């Protein structure tokens, strides 16, 4: 059975996702360190930080707010860097006449109230069979490593920029 800190975490997560009022007094004395730990573990630290903006009934300790704001600013910068990387990658692929659809991660992040506050990860591209073959030829020489291909899921490569980005392809079979 989830504890009060888990319940408070979900309260803040809902508030951050849907910009709804959050009431934490119902959970009594919450452990903000545990809530932040859960948020980091689930890669939703920025969303939980956004949820804190909607707390109406208790005062969140200043040191907690400062720590979360600092972490969220780092997430925001990582997203800005990733968005620049994605734009450059898509432009490079277009020059090679490769057409891809950005899916999951960075694409879905744009649906969030604060897209830059969502933890960024890898780059997932949906490609036709022909475009996948073209992308393999283009990206493999640039990669720091190339992964084994599987019939249903293909993780093509790790590219060397700051954080490791991957090009994926999932088949519908």
Language-model features and meaning:
Residues 30, 107-109, 158-162:
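Short amphipathic alpha-helical surface micro-motifs
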Residues 58, 112-113, 158-159:
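Short Asp/Glu-rich motifs
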Residues 61, 65, 119, 164-166:
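Alpha-helix boundary/capping detector
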Residues 78, 86, 140-173:
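Conserved catalytic core of two-metal-ion nucleotidyltransferases
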Residues 2-11, 18-104:
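Helical scaffold of the NTase/Pol beta-like nucleotidyltransferase catalytic core
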Residues 87-136, 140:
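Active-site nucleotide-donor binding segment shared across nucleotidyl transfer reactions
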Residues 16, 51, 138-141:
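Acidic/proline-rich low-complexity IDRs
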Residues 54, 108-109, 154:
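Positions that flank functional sites
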């Amino acid at each position: 059975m989830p504890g009060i800190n888990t319940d408070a975490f979900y309260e803040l997560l809902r508030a951050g996702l849907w910009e709804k009022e959050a009431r934490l007094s119902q959970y009594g004395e919450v452990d903000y360190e545990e809530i932040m730990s859960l948020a980091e573990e689930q890669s939703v630290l920025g969303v939980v930080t956004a949820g804190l903006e909607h707390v109406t009934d208790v005062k969140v300790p200043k040191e907690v707010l400062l720590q979360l704001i600092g972490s969220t600013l780092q997430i925001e910068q990582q997203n800005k860097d990733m968005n620049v990387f994605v734009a450059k990658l898509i432009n490079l692929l277009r020059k090679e006449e490769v057409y891809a659809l950005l899916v999951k991660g960075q694409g879905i992040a744009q649906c969030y109230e604060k897209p830059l506050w969502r933890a960024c990860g890898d780059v997932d591209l949906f490609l036709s069979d022909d475009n996948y073959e073209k992308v393999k030829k283009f990206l493999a020489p640039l990669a720091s490593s190339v992964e084994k291909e599987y019939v249903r899921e293909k993780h093509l490569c790790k590219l060397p920029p700051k954080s490791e980005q991957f090009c994926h392809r999932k088949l519908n079979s």
